[in-house]
Amino acid sequence: MSTNPKPAFRRILLKLSGEALMGDEGFGIDPKVLDRMAQEVKELVELGIQVGVVIGGGNLFRGEGLAKAGMNRVVGDHMGMLATVMNGLAMRDALHRAYVNARLMSAIPLKGVCDDYNWAEAISLLKSGRVVIFAAGTGNPFCTTDSAACLRGIEIEAEVVLKGTKVDGVYSDDPMKNPEAVKYDELSYTEVLDKELKVMDLAAFTMARDHDMPILVFNMNKPGALRRVVMGEEEGTLIKAK
C-alpha cells in the first residue's frame, strides 16, 4: 500500500447520499454521524484540499412511493430538492460548529435561507479555502443528485467525484446479498457499462464519462476512509478512462 505524504487531489467533489446521514436511524439526520462527517471534511480542508459537497435527500423524502400513489413526478422532485437543502443546512451548521468556513448554494432560489448557485462565486470560494455545499440538485426535475454531483464536479473542475456510500467500493454483485461478490479496485467506464455494475444512474455516469471525470466509490461510514482516499491510498473503487 503506497502512502503519499501529499494529497492525491487538489480539488474534489464529495457526493454523500442522504441515507448516509441517517446512521442507524430509519429516518432523518443522526447528529453524531453529521458531526463525524464534518470532522472528516475539516481534515481535508486542513490538508489544503478544496472541497465541494453534494448531498442527496433520501433520508428525508422519497418520491417514488408518492409517485406510484399518483403524485406528479415534478412535484415529488421539487420536494426532493427541498430535502437536499435541509441536509445542506444541517451540514453547513455542523461545519461551522467545527470551525470550518462553509457556504450553501442552492440551484433553486431560497432568499434568506442560502445563496443562489453561482459558478464563478463557487470557484472563488473554493480557492479561498471555503467548503461549498451544492443543494437542490441541478434545479431540474428528472435529474438525480448523482447527476448534480457530476455536473457540479465538472463545472468546478474537480479532479474527482468521490461517491460516499454504505459499501466500500464497487462489487460484481450486491455484497449484502451475495457473499461471493468480488470487489473491484479499479474499473474503466466501459467495463462498468459492459458488466452493468450499479455505480450511479446512467445519465450521471455517462456525463462523467463524456467529460473524463474520474469517480471513486468508497464507504463514508468507515472512519478515516475519506482521508485515505484523498491521500491516494488503496481505498474504494476508482473508475476512470483506460
UniProtKB/Swiss-Prot annotation:
It is found in: Cytoplasm. UMP binds at residues 57, 77, 138-145. Residues 23-28 are annotated as: Involved in allosteric activation by GTP. InterPro entries: AceGlu_kinase-like_sf, Asp/Glu/Uridylate_kinase, Uridylate_kinase, Uridylate_kinase_bac. The keyword Kinase applies. Keywords: Allosteric enzyme, ATP-binding, Cytoplasm, Kinase, Nucleotide-binding, Pyrimidine biosynthesis, Transferase. It catalyses: UMP + ATP = UDP + ADP. Its EC number is 2.7.4.22. One of its GO terms (cellular component) is cytosol. Allosterically activated by GTP. Inhibited by UTP. One of its GO terms (biological process) is UDP biosynthetic process. Catalyzes the reversible phosphorylation of UMP to UDP. Homohexamer. Belongs to the UMP kinase family. PANTHER family: URIDYLATE KINASE, URIDYLATE KINASE PUMPKIN, CHLOROPLASTIC. This is Uridylate kinase. It comes from Shewanella sp. (strain ANA-3). The lineage of its organism: Bacteria, Pseudomonadati, Pseudomonadota, Gammaproteobacteria, Alteromonadales.
